[in-house]
């Protein structure tokens, strides 16, 4: 009897799966806006695919992946001279699986990006596809994923590696835009509360977080100089750390310059501290991809070198373990990759709940839309509840969309490529197993992204001085 009731309970969700997001999540968040709920669902789909990609890297999945016809051919080859390769499969199948899943996700979101180009309101028939028909969209996505596993090897992995590296670099810049937006909104919110009442409390809170971020950045710089450089080597690392430290100091000084404060009073050191810490992370992440292991210690050797002086006997020499290559299933995630995924999740969730009406960065990128009126939609939602109708998420896009559907899907497409590169540690498909690490192009992509990030942040500060005809208040 319980099973029958369960079937009918699941069947009740079928109409919602074929309709809009307002129905799909109406019982969970009945007072939410349709634009927010839709983005959260897409974000959940992307996060779920990330989990699936990670599971595919586990050793337990290797047996099942080997059974796929032709899947053990081409890309991420293991040479006999490097390791006793499995005679049935000499390929890092875990990495190949991640490439296939990310390919399916990227294609799915790229097609939707093209399909949703120039959608202005929810009255557009294409908006119904964007906000609804979840059953068919999920089924199509699963179909693309399954089909991608049967793509012939050949040059697929090598070509997709280049595409993934470019897409991941672009998404790093998008993360910076979101972080700048978040920092501006955070600072503006707390400054407003400080002006409204209890200024000492909010001033202390701003000062505490700003100081904490700068202290963490200084500690990071010290650790990078100590463990990622050598007196007689690692010249590139010394250059990367030094130039980014100088650029962060310059950006912080610009943020509190009187001319900047005059045209943009909301700018301050809180935003600069967030960007500085993110830049230091990008610097560490870039150096963690260097091929030279002597200038790129892994996390375990990093910790050992810190604790060795206290753990080793006085008359002995502490032995630092040599880094070990990833397992053949490709299941190892480096520490910087975990942090990268954590930052990715935060930015993805923020991009799903933010609105264009309170975005500082949208004004700089000409992508904001402040003309959307929410009063009518809120009133209609309340009247539905009074009439006894089922409460659903409010359609707040009848007069104009709250965000660009096309750009949102393009961001998710780039995010899929970023996940692919992160889960595979930016490894090149043609790298030998005994030196399984990223090549210099991946290092330069990340470090260049950190420079562009800083330049982009400085632009958000000086834009009011340059574009005097625009309103940045």
Swiss-Prot record:
Reactions listed under catalytic activity: a 1,2-diacyl-sn-glycero-3-phospho-L-serine(in) = a 1,2-diacyl-sn-glycero-3-phospho-L-serine(out); a 1,2-diacyl-sn-glycero-3-phosphocholine(in) = a 1,2-diacyl-sn-glycero-3-phosphocholine(out); a 1,2-diacyl-sn-glycero-3-phosphoethanolamine(in) = a 1,2-diacyl-sn-glycero-3-phosphoethanolamine(out)
Compartments where found: Cell membrane; Golgi apparatus membrane
Function: Restriction factor required to restrict infectivity of gammaretroviruses: acts by inhibiting an early step of viral infection. Impairs the penetration of the viral particle into the cytoplasm. Non-ATP-dependent, non-specific lipid transporter for phosphatidylserine, phosphatidylcholine, and phosphatidylethanolamine. Functions as a scramblase that flips lipids in both directions across the membrane. Phospholipid scrambling results in gammaretroviral surface exposure of phosphatidylserine and loss of membrane asymmetry, which leads to loss of infectivity.
Cytoplasmic side: 118-132, 181-203, 261-329, 428-446
Pfam families from the UniProt entry: Serinc
Modifications the protein undergoes after translation, according to the UniProt entry: N-glycosylated.
Phosphoprotein as UniProt keyword: yes
Source taxon at top rank: Eukaryota
Keywords: Antiviral defense, Cell membrane, Glycoprotein, Golgi apparatus, Immunity, Innate immunity, Membrane, Phosphoprotein, Transmembrane, Transmembrane helix
Classification via InterPro entries: TDE1/TMS
Membrane-spanning ranges: 97-117, 133-153, 160-180, 204-224, 240-260, 330-350, 407-427, 447-467
Glycosylation sites (chain numbering): 34
Residue ranges, Extracellular side: 1-96, 154-159, 225-239, 351-406, 468-473
GO MF term list: phospholipid scramblase activity
Family classification: Belongs to the TDE1 family.
Membrane-protein topology: Multi-pass membrane protein
GO annotation, cellular component aspect: Golgi membrane; plasma membrane
Record PTM Phosphoserine, positions in chain: 371
Protein name: Serine incorporator 3
GO biological process: antiviral innate immune response; plasma membrane phospholipid scrambling; positive regulation of endoplasmic reticulum stress-induced intrinsic apoptotic signaling pathway
């Amino acid at each position: 009897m319980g099973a029958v009731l369960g079937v009918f309970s699941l069947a009740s969700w079928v109409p919602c799966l074929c309709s809009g997001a307002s129905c799909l999540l109406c019982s969970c968040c009945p007072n939410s806006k349709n634009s927010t709920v839709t983005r959260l669902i897409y974000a959940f789909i992307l996060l779920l695919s990330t989990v699936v990609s990670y599971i595919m890297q586990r050793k337990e999945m290797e047996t099942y992946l080997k059974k796929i016809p032709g899947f053990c051919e081409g890309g991420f080859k293991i040479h006999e001279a490097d390791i006793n390769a499995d005679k049935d499969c000499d390929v890092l199948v875990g990495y190949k699986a991640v490439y296939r899943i990310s390919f399916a996700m990227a294609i799915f979101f790229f097609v939707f990006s093209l399909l949703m180009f120039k959608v202005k309101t929810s009255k557009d028939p294409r908006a119904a596809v964007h906000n609804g028909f979840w059953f068919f969209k999920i089924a199509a996505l699963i179909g693309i994923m399954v089909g991608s596993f049967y793509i012939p090897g050949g040059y697929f992995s090598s070509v997709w590696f280049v595409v993934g590296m470019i897409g991941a670099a672009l998404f790093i810049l998008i993360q910076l835009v979101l972080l700048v937006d978040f920092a501006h909104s955070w600072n503006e919110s707390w400054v407003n509360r400080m002006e409204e009442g209890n200024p000492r409390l909010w001033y202390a809170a701003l000062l505490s977080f700003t100081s904490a971020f700068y202290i963490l950045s200084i500690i990071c710089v010290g650790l990078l100089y100590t463990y990622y450089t050598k007196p007689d080597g690692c010249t590139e690392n010394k250059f990367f750390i030094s130039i980014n430290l100088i650029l962060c100091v310059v950006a912080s000084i610009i943020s509190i310059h009187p001319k900047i404060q005059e045209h943009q009073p909301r700018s301050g050191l809180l935003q600069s501290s967030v960007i500085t810490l993110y830049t230091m992370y990008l610097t560490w992440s870039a150096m963690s991809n260097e091929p030279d292991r002597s200038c790129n210690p892994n996390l375990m050797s990093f910790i050992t070198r810190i604790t060795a002086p206290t753990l080793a006997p006085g008359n002995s020499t502490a032995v630092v373990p040599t880094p070990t290559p990833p397992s053949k299933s490709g299941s190892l995630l480096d520490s910087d990759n975990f942090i990268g995924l954590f930052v990715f999740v935060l930015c993805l969730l923020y991009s799903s709940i933010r609105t264009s009406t309170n975005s500082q960065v949208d004004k700089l990128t000409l992508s904001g839309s402040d003309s959307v009126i929410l009063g009518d939609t809120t009133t209609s939602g309340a009247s539905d509840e009074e009439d006894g109708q089922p409460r659903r998420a409010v359609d707040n896009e009848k007069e104009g969309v709250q965000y660009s559907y096309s750009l949102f899907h393009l961001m998710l497409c780039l995010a899929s490529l970023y996940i692919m590169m992160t889960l595979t540690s930016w490894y090149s498909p043609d790298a030998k197993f005994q030196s399984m690490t990223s090549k210099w192009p991946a290092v330069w992509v990340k470090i260049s992204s950190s420079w562009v990030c800083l330049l982009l942040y400085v632009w958000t500060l000086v834009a009011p001085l340059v574009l005097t005809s625009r309103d940045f208040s």
